[in-house]
Amino acid sequence: MSRAEALASVLEGTESLAIVCHDNPDPDCLASALALKTIAADAGVDNVTIAYGGEISHQQNRAFVNMLDIGLESITAVTTDEYDCLAFVDHTVPGANSVLSATVTPDIVVDHHPGNARNATFADVRTEYGATATIFVEYLRDLEIELTSRLASALLFALHRERLDFVREPTRREYEAALSVYSDADLEVLEQLYGSAFSPGTIDAIGRAIASRTRRGSSLVASAGDTAETDALPQAADYLLNLEGVDTVLVYGIVGDAIRMSARSIDPRIHIGETLVDGFDEFGAVGGHHDMAGGRIELGLFADDAGDRDQLLEFVGGRLTRRFFSALNLENER
């Protein structure tokens, strides 16, 4: 039995399915959720809900949801216990990158990030893949499910945004997956998605990151400040990675009640996910891939060390900067 058939067998006989995205979901997560919903419908599941935590603040992600008409529910409005089956897409560990309790056990897990899918009835975690959408393209092909233009467009955009648009080790599988969905995708929709406008908040956060950057050798750290735009952090990190002579970037900021971090590296000697774990694992949830990673640290850990949020940001920024450069063995670099 193939993995696609094993997934379908879990869904057969299921009446209701809750698909939970990670917090602040990106196109890879959203397209994967849409693909799983399609597979579930093909298996006869009548009631399917796609839920997410956090917010969708990246301008392309908002346009992605609206233009492709992806129905989403806030996880706070969904009681997962009321569903026969619970699925995680593009994340593995409950509580690590979602508001769900760490005690929750998903029935289905499909992901390309490192993680232990404990006790799941069906788990397919392929860290050698560059995108979760790639896995779902293979499922759809193996199950001979016909692609709609909407689903093909979602998967193609996800593959590009997750890997193919960047020098981030896209695997041969991402190119093959993109080729297989290309003919069914609406290229005009993709063109409009790429033209999505930045929000003023995102521009402000990226501007603060550019102005605040601190560099050691080919690595730098920057602050996006106190922002409501979670997705501004990875966008700022991507932008700063274009600076001449820079190959590793960490951008941090205060978002709501937490410090968020986004890191990028194109240095083959650096595993940026492991670097964040080395520097910040004792403070919060961090991790990621060889070339891209992120993390979240609760503000409560530092609340007693500073007064207002500006002072807190300055205090936290100093500590994060020192620990990041230390994890890269750049304490004495200039």
Give, region by region, the residue ranges found by the protein language model.
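Active-site cofactor/cluster-binding pocket
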Residues: A63, I70-N119
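Short alpha-helices
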Residues: V110-A177
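Divalent metal-coordination and catalytic microenvironments
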Residues: D26, L36, V65, D111, ...
